[in-house]
Amino acid sequence: MLVKIELYHDGEFWCARGIGEDIFTQGATLDEAVENIKEAVAVHYDEAEQPTSILILSEIELGSRTTTAS
């Protein structure tokens, strides 16, 4: 089974929520959030239905890009 997680930065924390699942966690750093995702997924499912993979989807802002006309 594949679990899909949306990961985003809310300005202070990295937040993660399950897509189609009642899973939510967060972390102060990206690495902490990923570890918390693994733990949250593990406790969400019974032992018999543990997922085999976690797909983490994230949008990361690159900052403002300016273009100049030539």
Functional labels for PLM-detected ranges:
Residues 12-14, 29, 36:
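Generic hydrophobic secondary-structure packing signal
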Residues 1-6, 10, 35-70:
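Short, charged, surface-exposed hinge/linker loops at domain edges
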Residues 21-31:
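A short, exposed loop/beta-hairpin motif centered on an aromatic-Gly-Thr core
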